[in-house]
Swiss-Prot record:
It is found in: Virion. SUPFAM superfamilies: Head-to-tail joining protein W, gpW. One of its GO terms (cellular component) is virion component. Plays a role in morphogenesis of the virion head after genome packaging. Presumably interacts with the portal vertex to stabilize the packaged DNA within the head after packaging. Probably binds to the head-tail connector protein gp8. Gene3D superfamilies: Head-to-tail joining protein W. Keywords: Late protein, Viral capsid assembly, Viral release from host cell, Virion. Pfam families: gpW. It comes from Enterobacteria phage P21 (Bacteriophage 21). This is Head completion protein gp3.
């Protein structure tokens, strides 16, 4: 069972990834490689799953139609 705290941690991880705070760099033999510790698609999928379990999904409302 997913907790609200775990959902918040997933959202923070996504924010960190998007803002570049989760970039890992390795330097060896004069070569430098940078990569992210998690993929954005995996984080979004995990967040959607957690929201579904907790019942906190954000349902979009239909646009209101205008009748004249």
């Amino acid at each position: 069972m997913v907790t609200v705290a775990e959902l918040q941690a997933l959202r923070q991880a996504r924010l960190d990834l998007l803002t570049g705070k989760r970039v890992v760099s390795v330097q060896k033999d004069g070569r430098r490689i940078e990569y992210t510790a998690a993929s954005l698609d995996e984080l979004n999928r995990a967040i959607n799953d957690a929201e579904s379990v907790l019942g906190t999904t954000r349902c979009r409302r239909r646009p209101l139609g205008v009748r004249l």
